[in-house]
């Protein structure tokens, strides 16, 4: 089993630092609280935010994650994951093929996929997704149910 697969197999708590819910000024403190709380992986999610700003946010929290030995995953943006030296990327259904993410980030990168049906989950697994996310099951302020 590869290092990333070992890490994912041991992952029990996947934290999401979502700027749709967090104040930008609270990002580092929120990530620090997630790390102190024992998360095994953190995803930075910032829908409807300019790519340059997301990169700046990623660069602010990457050192915290690295110091804690917790992989940082960037939502949707392979380019930000690459530039911020994140551990990987989480892709939605419309965010391109998984193979393109590995081409850009290397095969050691963690690449996950959002799924909303059994068919999408099976497709993601066939394409080699390192993990799949399910949902949303219920509507939220940033996602329909």
Label every model-predicted segment.
Residues 44, 81, 138-144:
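A short acidic, helix-capping loop that chelates divalent metal ions and anchors anionic groups
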Residues 98, 120, 140-141:
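Short glycine-rich, flexible loops that bind phosphorylated cofactors or substrates
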């Amino acid at each position: 089993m590869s290092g990333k697969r070992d890490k994912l197999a041991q992952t029990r708590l996947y934290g999401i630092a979502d700027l749709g819910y967090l104040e930008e000024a609270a990002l580092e403190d929120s990530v620090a609280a997630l790390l102190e709380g024992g998360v095994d992986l953190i995803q930075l999610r910032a829908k409807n935010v300019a790519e340059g700003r997301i990169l700046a946010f990623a660069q602010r929290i990457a050192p915290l994650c690295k110091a804690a030995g917790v992989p940082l995953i960037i939502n949707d943006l392979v380019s930000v994951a690459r530039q911020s030296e994140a551990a990987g990327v989480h892709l939605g259904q419309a965010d391109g093929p998984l193979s393109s993410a590995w081409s850009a980030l290397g095969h050691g990168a963690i690449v996950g996929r959002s799924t909303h049906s059994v068919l999408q989950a099976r497709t993601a697994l066939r394409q080699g997704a390192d993990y799949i996310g399910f949902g949303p099951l219920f509507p939220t302020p940033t996602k329909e149910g």
